[in-house]
């Protein structure tokens, strides 16, 4: 068991890095970062440079069912904060707030290097990023079993099979180009070379636990496939159980480029007239071929448990051990297999659809739909925003989003240019400060860019259909 826990920790910690997108960013088109959400977008300035460590860091974390106050809340009798696990808390109140299926997510990304420049009516960009994502989806039955035991399922089978786990950490090297092909249409394409660093997924997870009506026997049925990569060497015993986990003595730079992949981003912006424009993009459409330090583990079988009788062990000098016999029975009933076969992992693509209404040169209103696919499920969000550019050096955005089953997401973004530097910070959840107890998710993005040629870019855009 300790070896299994150690292996999970290695997988888990290997996947936590830096973060992804804020909805508010999409229409802050004075920032070079807009090309990460739509490759047809062209930054305001003729040239930009991203420095390692300061160009952009982003964090997105949350879930789709529970608010902060569902987990931590005030106990008036104790005059203190308690969790739902406190002895005075009603665990049923917590369970009743769960959906049949519940999602938890963490997105992280960091810009390592980037550069872009305008060439006539086109715009080139090159970026190096580290991206990570973690998703866990669990059924309500699993939470009920964990918190109340199997007494809630007497004579029934608890559904544990809708559990899924997905975690990915990779490097991304992208080369993008955006160009106006008609007076009112701009298109963009970004090609990405990917290098997988660590990965873990419950590819198939079918499991159920049956409890007899009198509670004196259990029957566990499993059909599970786990796939992952991590810089460890795993050995198993004759029954397929993990026997040993070893880390390599040294890791070279070449080890970071042994899991290659490829992806593309495609986008377009259409300017209907001086007041309306529309945009669409598909990003992260691709895959990674994992073939280095690959680990595949399957668990299949059915195991029945009726308890352990230790009464016969009293005064018995024999060498029989009931717990050892139980372990032997488990090994005989459940088949485990370990392999190192290569596998393809497809990224979770995202689709952005946007519309914009321009009141004038300095003010516009935007609508954005984002559809995100991951681990066999779909996450949908919508954003309305008001975007203003009161002076040349400042741009502001105020947004309202419906996301993760919550309707109280108010966001804001600020970009300030002090040539040759541009500073920015944004979030979709400043409402967290107003209603912290009702918060289900939070994201923030901030950084600094080096930019040049911004005034010239304005003159060029007056002759091209760039969204402002």
Predicted regions and their residues:
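Subset of outer-membrane beta-barrel
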Residues: 20-468
């Amino acid at each position: 068991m300790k070896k299994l826990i150690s292996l999970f920790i290695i997988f888990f910690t290997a996947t936590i890095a830096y973060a992804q997108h804020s909805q508010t960013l999409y229409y802050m088109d004075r920032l070079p970062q807009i090309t990460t959400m739509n490759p047809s977008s062209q930054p305001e300035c003729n040239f930009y440079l991203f420095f390692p460590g300061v160009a952009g860091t982003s964090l997105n974390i949350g879930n789709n069912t529970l608010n902060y106050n569902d987990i931590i809340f005030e106990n008036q009798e104790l005059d203190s904060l308690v969790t739902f696990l406190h002895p005075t808390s009603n665990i049923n109140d917590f369970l009743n707030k769960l959906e049949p299926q519940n999602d938890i997510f963490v997105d992280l990304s960091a810009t390592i290097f980037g550069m872009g420049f305008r060439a006539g009516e086109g715009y080139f960009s090159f970026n190096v990023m580290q991206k990570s994502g973690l998703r866990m989806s669990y059924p309500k039955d699993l939470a009920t079993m964990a918190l109340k035991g199997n007494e809630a399922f007497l004579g029934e089978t608890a559904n544990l099979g809708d559990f899924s786990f997905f975690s990915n950490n990779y490097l991304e090297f992208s080369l993008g180009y955006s160009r106006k092909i008609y007076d009112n249409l701009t298109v963009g394409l970004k090609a990405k070379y990917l290098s997988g660093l660590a990965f873990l997924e419950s590819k198939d997870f079918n499991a159920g636990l049956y409890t007899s009506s009198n509670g004196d026997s259990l029957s566990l049925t499993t059909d599970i496939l786990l796939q992952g990569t991590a810089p460890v060497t795993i050995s198993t015993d004759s029954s397929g159980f993990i026997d040993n986990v070893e880390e390599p003595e040294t890791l070279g730079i070449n080890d970071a480029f042994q899991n290659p992949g490829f992806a593309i981003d495609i986008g377009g912006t259409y300017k209907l007239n001086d007041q309306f424009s529309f945009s669409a993009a598909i990003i992260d459409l691709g895959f990674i071929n994992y073939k280095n330090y690959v680990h595949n583990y399957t668990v299949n079988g059915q195991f029945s448990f009726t308890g352990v009788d230790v009464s016969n062990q009293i005064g018995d000098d024999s060498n029989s051990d009931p717990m050892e016999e139980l372990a032997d029975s488990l090994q005989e009933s459940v088949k485990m297999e370990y392999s190192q076969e290569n596998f393809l992992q497809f990224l979770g693509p995202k689709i952005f659809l946007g519309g914009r209404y321009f009141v004038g040169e300095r003010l516009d209103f935007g609508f954005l739909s984002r559809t995100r696919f991951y681990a066999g499920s779909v996450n949908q969000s919508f954003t309305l925003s008001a975007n203003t550019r009161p002076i040349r050096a400042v741009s502001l955005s105020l947004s309202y989003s419906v996301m993760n089953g919550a309707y109280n997401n108010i966001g804001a973004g600020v970009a300030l240019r002090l040539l040759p530097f541009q500073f920015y910070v944004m979030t979709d959840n400043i409402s967290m400060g107003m209603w912290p107890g009702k918060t289900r998710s939070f994201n923030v993005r901030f950084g600094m860019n080096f930019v040049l040629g911004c005034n010239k870019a304005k003159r060029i855009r007056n002759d091209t259909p760039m969204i402002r």
